[in-house]
């Protein structure tokens, strides 16, 4: 007969009791009622927060945007093709965040910060919330350092400062992306981290931008965040916030950053699509009522930080596309009112061969000459005035055939000044080259040349001054001022090159 050993049994029971885990895990769950068009309606999830991430049974992540009395409206961060009606959903207790690190430089990622360039995983030890609050008034200081774009028309007349938000606005095919990418190219050696956010564009266009940045060595200091036209609306809506979070990471580490949103019209359309599918009431142009807040909370994150926070900066260049030049549509007026100025690109100027096609008349920088070095202020004031007078005279001269000599001279000068503002794509100029170019035009040295000769002469002049009068560039670079000494070097160089050029042309 088997003997029952009571001590052994009691030991086993004691062990079992000691191993018993009293912890109770409470999971906030719900059931899928309906799914489709990137939207899911969930029953349950009673304690979910607005903006909280939820996870579906098959792994798709969504964001709870609409909290209604009997269901929760969730936007999906994927295609959601495997989600079934009746399947369970659980709240994660987190809000959207992304990993951030220096390793992202030179990479192409999507809105969830996953690499899409086929070059392996990106290591990151820190993370940042995709939507974080903008710096407050005390955390900022006024914009005072220039951010050079390398484009004469912008740096002289519509200057951009570090920490500013300058809108680039125009019809399709007017060179908006070209202005933005040229600005990235010009940051080489300036210790500025660039983030280019492509929203709802063709994959081929994004590939073209990435290739041109790689060819010129600009990807070393650039991160590209891309959500193409075939991406879910949720990801197109999130992409700009992801870019801003990456730029903020560098800004708070006392670095200067430049972020380009290309373009916010497509983000607004993606948000409109999500809102209408969630049955939020439509407003003007069928956009939801909070579309202004969509852009304002994004653009307010651009700032020039105070000296206590390390003087880092985040400069934003949002791009907005207009329909046949209508700047008074809903999204353009919203973004104009949020930003510190706008660069307006005109299709008429573009077609007339004036490129970059910047309409100087209605473009403006609300930071103004605070974002220019002294030498640029000295030469740019005269340029603005002469171009404004030229625009007025040109309109007037169309009605009058017999003009006096002074008016004819002024028109001729204006045409040459307009010519010197033309620039090829991907050929940014240093600030010293811009100063010498503007000085040559405003002081009448180009008046004796034919309009067709102006650009050829200016290219040769820049090369000549670089090799024969390097002192000019050294003085400007060190003092940031057009001193009498620098001016004399510049005058000598222009006179010598002008004589050589005219001789060459005669021959």
From Swiss-Prot:
Q: What is the catalytic activity of this protein?
A: ATP + H2O + 4 H(+)(in) = ADP + phosphate + 5 H(+)(out)
Q: Name one Pfam family in it.
A: ATP-synt_ab_C
List of residues that carry Phosphothreonine? 257
Q: Which PROSITE patterns match?
A: ATPASE_ALPHA_BETA
Record membrane topology: Peripheral membrane protein
Keywords carried by this UniProt record: ATP synthesis, ATP-binding, CF(1), Chloroplast, Hydrogen ion transport, Ion transport, Membrane, Nucleotide-binding, Phosphoprotein, Plastid, Thylakoid, Translocase, Transport
Enzyme Commission identifier(s): 7.1.2.2
In which compartments does the protein localize? Plastid, Chloroplast thylakoid membrane
Gene Ontology terms: biological process: response to cold
Q: Does the keyword Transport apply?
A: yes
List the record's Gene Ontology CC terms alphabetically: chloroplast; chloroplast thylakoid; chloroplast thylakoid membrane; cytosol; mitochondrion; plastid; proton-transporting ATP synthase complex; stromule
Q: Which domain of life is it from?
A: Eukaryota
Q: Which GO terms describe its molecular function?
A: ATP binding; mRNA binding; proton-transporting ATP synthase activity, rotational mechanism; zinc ion binding
Q: Where is this site: Required for activity?
A: 363
Positions with a binding annotation for ATP: 170-177
Q: How does it assemble?
A: F-type ATPases have 2 components, CF(1) - the catalytic core - and CF(0) - the membrane proton channel. CF(1) has five subunits: alpha(3), beta(3), gamma(1), delta(1), epsilon(1). CF(0) has four main subunits: a, b, b' and c.
Role according to the record: Produces ATP from ADP in the presence of a proton gradient across the membrane. The alpha chain is a regulatory subunit.
Family, according to the entry, reads as follows: Belongs to the ATPase alpha/beta chains family.
From the Swiss-Prot or TrEMBL record, give the protein name.
ATP synthase subunit alpha, chloroplastic
Species annotation = Arabidopsis thaliana (Mouse-ear cress)
């Amino acid at each position: 007969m088997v003997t029952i050993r009571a001590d052994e049994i009691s030991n086993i029971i004691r062990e079992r009791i000691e191993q018993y885990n009293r912890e109770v895990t409470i999971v906030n769950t719900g059931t899928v009622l309906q799914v489709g068009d990137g939207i899911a309606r969930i029953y349950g999830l009673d304690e979910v927060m607005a903006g909280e991430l939820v996870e579906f049974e098959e792994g798709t992540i969504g964001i709870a945007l609409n909290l209604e009395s009997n269901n929760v409206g969730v936007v999906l961060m994927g295609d959601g093709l495997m989600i079934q009606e009746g399947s369970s959903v659980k709240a994660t207790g987190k809000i959207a965040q992304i990993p951030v690190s220096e390793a992202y430089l030179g990479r192409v990622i999507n809105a969830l910060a996953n690499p899409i360039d086929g070059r392996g995983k990106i290591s990151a030890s820190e993370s940042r919330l995709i939507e974080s609050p903008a710096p407050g008034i005390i955390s900022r200081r006024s914009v005072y350092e220039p951010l050079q774009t390398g484009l004469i028309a912008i740096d002289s007349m519509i200057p951009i400062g570090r920490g500013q938000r300058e809108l680039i606005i125009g019809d399709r095919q007017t060179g908006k992306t070209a202005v933005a990418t040229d600005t990235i190219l010009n940051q080489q050696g300036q210790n500025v981290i660039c983030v280019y956010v492509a929203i709802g564009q063709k994959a081929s266009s994004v590939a073209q931008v990435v290739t041109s940045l790689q060819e010129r060595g600009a990807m070393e200091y650039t991160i590209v965040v891309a959500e193409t036209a075939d991406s879910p609306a949720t990801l197109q809506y999130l992409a700009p916030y992801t870019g801003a979070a990456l730029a903020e990471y560098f800004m708070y580490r006392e670095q200067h950053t430049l972020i380009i949103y290309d373009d916010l019209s497509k983000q607004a359309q993606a948000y409109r699509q999500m809102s209408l599918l969630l049955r939020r009431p439509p407003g003007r142009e069928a956009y939801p009522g909070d579309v202004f807040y969509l852009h304002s909370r994004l653009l307010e994150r651009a700032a020039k930080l105070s000296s206590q926070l390390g003087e880092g900066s985040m400069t934003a260049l949002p791009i907005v596309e207009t329909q046949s030049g209508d700047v008074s549509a809903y999204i353009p007026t919203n973004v104009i009112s949020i930003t510190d100025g706008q660069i307006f690109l005109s299709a008429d100027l573009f077609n007339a061969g004036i490129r970059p096609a910047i309409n100087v008349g209605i473009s403006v920088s609300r930071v103004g000459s605070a974002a220019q070095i002294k030498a640029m202020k000295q030469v740019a004031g005269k340029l603005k005035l002469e171009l404004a007078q030229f625009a007025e005279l040109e309109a007037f001269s169309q009605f009058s055939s017999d003009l006096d000599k002074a008016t004819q001279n002024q028109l001729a000068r204006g045409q040459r000044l307009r010519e010197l503002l033309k620039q090829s794509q991907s050929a940014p100029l240093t600030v010293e080259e811009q100063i010498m170019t503007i000085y040559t035009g405003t002081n009448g040295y180009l008046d004796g040349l034919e309009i067709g000769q102006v650009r050829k002469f200016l290219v040769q002049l820049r090369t000549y001054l670089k090799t024969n009068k390097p002192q000019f560039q050294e003085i400007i670079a060190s003092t940031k001022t057009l001193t009498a000494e620098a001016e004399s070097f510049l005058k000598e160089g222009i006179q010598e090159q002008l004589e050589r050029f005219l001789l060459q042309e005669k021959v």
